[in-house]
């Protein structure tokens, strides 16, 4: 029998067992009873400051300390939950119950992330409308979670597909769309840079305070521009804007994807389909404007360092310079801006490269310039033909293929030349697909003497190589080791070959020779700014967030377009914009390799919905709805705030409620950042949901809608529950529950068979495709929810992955049975505790357990808390009579982990109120600490003596006592080595 098969084996069902034994059947009765009581009495209702959301006793918050704990809410998939899913939910529930017992007003609720691709794909599989299947899945998942005994305030539950929720998601989009980022404005935290209403930008254009882009020289006023021209200019500033740029097009899914949804292999994260670069018109969000703040504010929140590092690396802040080169095109002189982290190497620039999508390629010459090498032309008769063909070839490649370091470097000459602003050199301008338009400016200056990729390209096309940095003298290295062989790649060294008598831009002399790299960068940046051809600047690896999808199952945009294509934001009174109920909601997908295919949004097929007659203030006109939908990340960007009051129809979140639950310093641990007190979820969301939520929150913070800088003050990443899976000799997965474990083989390893045939065991994830799923429903039926909770919380540290092994579940059941027997006579059902005084040993153990378990609960270490509670319970079992004064604190301490049995025992002990709000036990400090500990003395790893010593004994004193205790075994010789780990271990290595 395999480990997984044992999942279905219940606790004892022996009809001869005592009538009141705690078993699966009794556990189910107790759990059903208490879940109904909790529901009926509103035991876990959190009290708001104002309004109808009061606690179970009809009270508002009334100044009680607030604590807000939540989980990353689930996708309501058709598969339901397996036992790995609730790990985080159970952890947050334990924490929430503990904080209630500390007297805090705890907000703990659960909603459902119901839009997006998973729900749509499941609906496609079942042939039903996404709303029908999603609501059914929510009902099933809600049932499973409720049966687990999670202490949610169910009044606050919602799904992101609820019209009342969609309304506020669209409202937030509207605020972002109607905002721009003012670099000079001071945000509420006191630093520079803030989102401001677009109306303020318009006022700056109208007053002349800010120059109108594209009209600096023609003298046109803002009022002289027509509506379309004004909207085009504002579009370049809005935080939510329409862009026509290279995007990640996935034919296999029929939609575009954000960079974060594309794997390092250039495939879609969902479905593993190829992803291609296509220039399409899409919605984007200007998250890059918040790059520095998103990095800087990580210092003020309590997140795992690995997640902070992942966000810092993903944002990728780098300091360098923007430099303007002049390019003579068929349409006159054009500016080409590049970004470089090494402006000191401008003297070593021997060519330039632009992305195939770069706008300069619209103006290549009709004929090749004289004396162009044939291999620069790519075999084409003219630059126009060459560029057109190269662009088509680049479109057919994935982003990964284009930047793959190991791939062949392709490229061709454009027929254009760029002028170096310092040296005046005419640099041949190439196009190459390894330069991406959405990174930097889509143009690079190539320095083959200091960059391997540029060097390889220069060698391929026989371009000059100029070295501008040599090794530091103290390095022992020499430039001769590189010249003609390889680039010298270093961020430190001495600058060489970098001087000119008269610069092209200013005509002055400039020399960087002899300077260290950092000093040279500072000097050249100052020169660039003084010459008006560049400046020191900051760039980010982070790209603006691609925000539209060609899907049906998502939030519609609150945007319509006029006959001229100008976008118009719908008024808040028109929200929500609901999806039409249509029969044809499936996206049109294509051959996964069809890079030339074009997105076809499902909503575009519904003309009655798309074409509308509206009066937007200037009379009734015909408009056309945007047929894209928002990505599944939209609803999850702000859902934590809706828990504060999902019934509020007037506000996204009311200010008093926000300040109470999430404001800066709203409790002792919230800190300046404010936000949710505890947020539990998987590390896989580090650069997706968590980054997007922080961005939206900061925009709302800047605009004054929320008062905290961050959405989540403390983040905890739970580990993964893993399980065995089994395959037959063909490599196909077989049902784990049908696998039989046989005798060990010659190497002592267990053997397995399925249907009489050999089976192979492997260890990894739990999943439907692996046929090794164990569901909570199995556990409820065969052990009860409390045993399941206790086992899962006791498996190991929460942050670590751990193996599921059903044979160990019975150990958790036995612990609860022993606790039950300590209180209840299994034969009569009577309470068997006594009211006598505690003996000294019990008194000390109890108070030390209270002190230790409190520390473990504060640190979110329920596994070690359980271990200490087992020790206390075992001690009580050994007594002739179990004292009430010891078992009641034990029940209280166990209740966050196994609440149903503890409620039942608490009730049987005569208490009339639920223990959910009982006071957490406090240790009597007079009995905390140990009078002595046992120190083990080892010689060559074997225990040779044990000493009772003070817990704070001096290591030298312990060494002396240990040597005296084993002196006869050392034969009077001085030991070769003594290792003291006071107060518990002394290891001795004797002399030879």
Where are these regions (language model features)?
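Helix-rich, typically C-terminal accessory recognition domains appended to large enzymatic cores
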Residues: 113, 184-191, 236, 241-248, ...
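Residue patterns forming the tRNA-binding/recognition surfaces of aminoacyl-tRNA synthetases
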Residues: 2-27, 32-33, 37-41, 126-336, ...
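Catalytic alpha/beta core of large soluble enzyme barrels
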Residues: 92-93, 105, 362-471, 477, ...
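Amphipathic alpha-helical
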Residues: 35, 284-318, 359-412, 575-608, ...
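Basic, alpha-helical terminal appendages of large translation-related enzymes
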Residues: 1-62, 373, 464-475, 483-486, ...
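Conserved oxyanion/phosphate-binding beta-strand-loop segments in alpha/beta enzyme cores
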Residues: 2-10, 15-70, 100-109, 133-139, ...
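Alpha-helical recognition segments enriched in aromatics with Gly/Pro capping
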Residues: 150, 416-439, 468, 603-798
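N-terminal catalytic cores of NTP/NDP-binding nucleotidyl/phosphoryl-transfer enzymes
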Residues: 52-134, 158-169, 338-341, 420-457, ...
